[in-house]
């Protein structure tokens, strides 16, 4: 908008809008990895808490608390309580230092800043520059549009080199980036799959701000209205920050299509840019290692071969901080074999009565899943054939012929476990 007396530029001049959750990597998780050397698998708990010194309860966008999770999941699904907890661990001084390294001025940081709902307001240009440092191995370049001026004589020129500095360690840049890749993935609860560009390695973060209860009444807003929607994403070549909203705060975003607009616009722009200058993939630096850990362990433990797939994850660590101890929580599971197996021949009916017992029936076993029994039969030493799968402990086998040799085998089954057979 270049009309009017002040030539207002939303990209550069708009510093009155809150950034929402796009601030979380900059003020919470980036500093936690940089200064505390947190892993992407660091355990956190999404639970009901209040702001320090207040009875104001902190909520999540869906009104739920999801319990124990990794900080990776907490960030890519944009949970609020883990963000506030992370800010508490980092502390306002280190958060301020990290922001300052990215060209963002701040003072008097409070816990509401952890969610991008405080006084740290950032223009889209500054937001793009800050995120670019994550994709640039931790190096921050001040935003600029002019690199060289040639004077009227056509010979004299002056070049401008932007300020460039190391804002964070390469491990911080990569580990934050790796989490933010999940934001644009198809993972469950990922917030920006609409920003993904096929074949392009992209990382990014969404952000949404809220109206206060007084504003809902003042502006007569309908439920679900929001004032701002952000998406900031980057590759190894480009960083783009897109804000969506209206110049007047009283005019609200009221539909999901409006909320998603920054994502779809990002995708359109990045698709075009990448066709002309393709971006390479983000490269893991030597300062970062990966390990398979037990989700929710504290301190983190390495997963062993018996750890269920649902309870382990491969996460990133600053080299030298990865766990060395394996979990002892998960051990080989054995299922008791059936006992007291008997078979009797009923010549008149030409059938066999086969029965057995199992520890799951008297409570002496440790089985938690229901137990069923697979019954197999061999005739005269031939191949075994499964003749029944049952939860009972007795079956009748018809068509038994006198003079033949029958061998019955019973195997207990519970979930993925199979016992040794009883014959």
Functional labels for PLM-detected ranges:
Residues 350-367:
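Conserved aromatic anchor
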Residues 397-419:
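Beta-strand-rich modules
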Residues 385-392:
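Short beta-strand segments within Ig-like beta-sandwich modules, predominantly Fibronectin type-III
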Residues 38-95, 110, 140, 152-182:
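Conserved catalytic neighborhood of penicillin-recognizing serine enzymes
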Residues 18-44, 74, 130-134, 176, ...:
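Active-site SXXK
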Residues 373-375:
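Short beta-strand elements bearing conserved aromatic residues within extracellular beta-rich modules
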Residues 2-15, 123-129, 136-318:
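A penicillin-recognizing enzyme superfamily signal
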Residues 56-58, 91-129:
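Mid-domain, small-residue-enriched loop/turn segments at the edges of structured enzyme/sensor domains
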